[in-house]
């Protein structure tokens, strides 16, 4: 054993059939043993695992959870859209701002102008808030380049971030985020570029784990999204989708039928769409930050998701326009207060279900033997406090592959 954590109160998030507990129950006076970055022992204090003089970390009865996973972010961009925030407060709809060249295309212009190094330094600064909230894995999308070179530039930045010792990264190609201005009224030709040039080159450079699309009236049609999904799958990439955020185009059912790991936003998802998620074991990712910033009133169908036992993930959707929130714990609180999730559902949403949304459920999101040793150590008494309390520095340390990182 390389390192042993003792005197901790564990919230493992491991399934009940595997442990006899529900994963949310606090297991007091627990010990975790780590070897080569993996969990090798979890359980009651066991003197025998202290043989060999491992590094012993006394957690002093702190609460330990899996490291948090922010499974949907747009972390890499230049500029900001505070002016659009003001416009929306004056009553101008998001769709109208987008049609006038604002929205995503505003950020596209700024991001195209920025160098790779500039984008990297901006993104690393934004990570700090997420680290303080216990995040050990982050998903990062492209989607503000919308050309071959600029999408690759963004994904190269994400790859550089993945080389940091204290943050794991899952990368997503989101070239189908918006129609770039040079392809106005020629969106099918832009889809050709994505399928025939961008996806093959991204695969050649090994820059992405997933391909995502924005299936919406101001984005791309289900038929266009299906083409992108098929090209991604043909090149060995996994898929996910921004679906049913502003209307119901049945994009969630399409994505699920093609094997998507998750569909995200889903405010307008109906029962047929929920059934498709259940049939295909697709995660529903809730993004209350965007719901809040856009002052939406249409709630995701939480009762239906519960009825059909759909795993619900939660993410920041961190982006400059509709969710500039670099705090996953704030999002957990919003999921409870706005979407009426329980604190347990909220915690599952940023651990085991977030891992599943990225296809990482066999490696992260739980504290169990064989899983990667990623967890967060909190000065808290109960897991409900993670959703309940905001703005208090409760995090003692993050552990990534067994290595300890104390936050400032």
Curated annotation (Swiss-Prot):
Annotated InterPro entries: Amidohydro-rel, HutI, Metal-dep_hydrolase_composite, Metal_Hydrolase
Binding sites annotated in the UniProt record for Zn(2+): 72, 74, 242, 317
GO cellular component: cytoplasm
Compartments reported by the entry: Cytoplasm
Binding-site positions, 4-imidazolone-5-propanoate: 81, 144, 177, 245, 322
Cofactor: Zn(2+); Fe(3+)
Chain sites annotated for binding Fe(3+): 72, 74, 242, 317
Cysteine pairs bridged by disulfides in the record: none
SUPFAM superfamilies per UniProt: Composite domain of metallo-dependent hydrolases, Metallo-dependent hydrolases
The EC number(s) this enzyme carries: 3.5.2.7
Family according to the record: Belongs to the metallo-dependent hydrolases superfamily. HutI family.
Gene3D superfamilies in the cross-refs: Metal-dependent hydrolases (3.20.20.140), Urease, subunit C, domain 1 (2.30.40.10)
Pathway assignment: Amino-acid degradation; L-histidine degradation into L-glutamate; N-formimidoyl-L-glutamate from L-histidine: step 3/3
Identification of the protein by name: Imidazolonepropionase
Binding positions (N-formimidoyl-L-glutamate): 144, 319, 321
Organism: Aliivibrio fischeri (strain ATCC 700601 / ES114) (Vibrio fischeri)
Reactions listed under catalytic activity: 4-imidazolone-5-propanoate + H2O = N-formimidoyl-L-glutamate
Uppermost EC category: hydrolase
HAMAP family: HutI (MF_00372)
Biological function: Catalyzes the hydrolytic cleavage of the carbon-nitrogen bond in imidazolone-5-propanoate to yield N-formimidoyl-L-glutamate. It is the third step in the universal histidine degradation pathway.
